[in-house]
Amino acid sequence: YRSSIIVVSGDYSMIRQVYNSDYIYRCFLKPFNFNEIEESIEKIICENNYEMETDVKSKINKELKKLKFNFTYKGTKYLSECIYQIYKSNESDVDNLSKEFYPIVAEKYNKSVNTIYGNIKQAINAMFFDCEERILKEYFKYSFVVKPKPKEIVYIILNKLYG
């Protein structure tokens, strides 16, 4: 974890030795202000959360690209966001995307749940025609090709994220 260590010491020579390390976020020489340490910890947490969010979203989009989803479609963006929201919620079993997670995505993008659902279905239809049969069979472990439902796509990608 680069830039995630805060050093507090009364020994100036020790602080000088570690100051340029990639792992040091900030150094404090005693006496110090606790408010500054608290602010530094909050900044580290925010930066790490942002990096984790960016990494997860990148992995989701990578999986969608494998399936030949077209990112010019709004539905692809909504599907990606829906998968991210489920991942973030730590829900292991989602019964109804339309009732549980589409409203979250709809609120974020200021759209109706029906618009989110329709755009996701449109993106899936386009993906189904753009993606090779072989890729669909391998990815979804199908013996024959059928158009996947949104929930199937969500679960498969979540399983890949959880490893």
List each model region and its residues:
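Short loop/turn motifs at secondary-structure junctions
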Residues: 1-2, 23
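Hydrophobic aliphatic residue packing
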Residues: 5-6, 41, 107, 116
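Receiver (REC) domain switch/output surface
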Residues: 21-23, 36-49
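Receiver (REC) domain switch/active-site region of two-component response regulators
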Residues: 32-33
